[in-house]
Amino acid sequence: MSWYKKAKGDDPEYQKMKDWFTKRTDRHINSVQKYCKKLEDYDSKRFKGLIERGEEHDQSKFKDPEIDPYIYVTWSYKCKDDGVDWEPPKGMDDKMNEATTYHVLNNSHHPEFHAGEDSEVINEEDRDDPKRDKIIDGTKMPDIDIAEMVADWVSVGNERGNSAKGWADKNINARWKFTKAQENLIYELIEVCEGS
């Protein structure tokens, strides 16, 4: 174990952040699994295997190179939600952006995975704001990836007190480009998840 990891492991503040990350991420994954099941039950032929995919959802966040930066990403959201003024350590912002880029490029439930691009895939100033000067091409996403993406959006929306429909309205054809058929599918699946 490197001295850096040992020092962080001994830091009670870091341990508190790590515990929150684990609790929040596990809760998110469980929510995604619930919606993956709901969507596979809705159309078991079209979304066969979605339940199993839900079981693997975001597991990469618990491994290098994602885990450490995502502990800070998650803590940053918690502080923002709690109205706490908090800044990550110097140099961590870049690592947080790199980890997010790595995550979206290596997990097929993100449109960026399918776009064939490896730079400028997130807005480094505000990861939740669409990057207006560059739209990511999500038109190659298969339906099962779209279904997992919707399960993810609904879960995050529930966590943040927002709706996946609002997120879709804000981001479709602003952050991510989809075909009309994909767009219709996204809204249909959001309705399946949020409508009942």
Feature locations, PLM:
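Metal-dependent phosphohydrolase cores
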Residues: 1-196
